[in-house]
């Protein structure tokens, strides 16, 4: 769990913002959302494969767009 030390003469809002930023960097909220409901290992693999395929298609489309001639 991220811990911050409130500096001298630091407002509560600034300290809260620093804490939120440290939680975001640690990935705590994403972890909580992922663990909120049980997900079967097959659905995890299926979702990861889908994101992998989407990323690959995006990369290929970007390379093809770069290689097309514009005349």
Swiss-Prot record:
Molecular-function annotations in GO = structural constituent of ribosome
Q: Which GO terms describe its biological process?
A: translation
For region Disordered, the annotated ranges are: 47-71
Output compositional bias ranges, type Basic and acidic residues: 60-71
Spell out the PROSITE patterns in the cross-references. RIBOSOMAL_S21
Task: Show the GO cellular component annotation of the record.
Answer: ribonucleoprotein complex; ribosome
The record, for Pfam families, names: Ribosomal_S21
Name the domain of life.
Bacteria
Question: Which keywords belong to this entry?
Answer: Ribonucleoprotein, Ribosomal protein
Membrane spanning segments where?
none
Give the record's family classification: Belongs to the bacterial ribosomal protein bS21 family.
What's the protein here called?
Small ribosomal subunit protein bS21
Q: What organism is listed for this UniProt entry?
A: Actinobacillus succinogenes (strain ATCC 55618 / DSM 22257 / CCUG 43843 / 130Z)
Record gene name:
rpsU
